[in-house]
Amino acid sequence: GLFLAMGMSVDEILATSLDLNIPNFVKIRIGSFFNKFGFVDMAPIRKKLVEICGSDPSFSEIEMKIYISAFCMNTSETVYFSKDTHPDMKIIDAVCMSMAVPFIFACGKYNGETYVDGGMKEEYPLTPFFDKKPHEITCIKIKMNRMYQDDIETPKQFVETLVRSALSNRVTYETPIQVVEINVGDTNVFDFGMSYEEKIRLFNMGFTFLSA
C-alpha cells in the first residue's frame, strides 16, 4: 500500500521486492528485545523504506489517501492513521508500527504510546470502510496451513509459534465483503532469507488467485 501511494507501479514494486537482500537490514539482535521489545530493530528497515520511496513524506504531503493500522498497547485499541487524523505524521513511521509483529520486530512509539502490528487484533483492517457498500470492498487474506512444531528449542521457534497461534485467534467481521484468500501453504512468512525463486513462486501464486 505504501509503494502504491507513493506512485510506484506494480512492476516497480515487484522488481524492488525481488532485488531486496532482506538479511542486510533485518537482523536479529538480543539487545533490541530488551530495549524495544522485539528482536529486529526497525531503524534499518525504516531507512531502507525511505531509500526505496525516495522521500519521507507525511500523510498530508501525498495525494492518495491511505489508511495504516497499528494496535496501541496503552489503550488496547486499533488506531487507523491517515491524512484525516494524523496529517503531520510521517507515513513510514506508521508503516513501521504496522509491521511490528510482537516479539519479532521492535515496537513503535508515537506521542508517548507504544504500538504493534494492527493485524494482531483484527483479521481485516475494515473500520474506516464500514460506510462503504459491500461490493466496494475487497480484502486480500493470506492463509497459512496450521503447522505442527516438532521441537521448540530456540527463542526464534518459540516466537514464531506464538505469533502463528495469535494470528489464528483474531477478531473477524461478518460484513459481506469480497475476500480473496491466498493459501501460501507451509511457507514460512518469517523467512527473512527467502530465495529469489521462492519470491517468484509466491508472486505467481498471488497473481493466479487474484486473476481467477
Predicted regions located by residue number:
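Patatin-like phospholipase
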Residues: 2-212
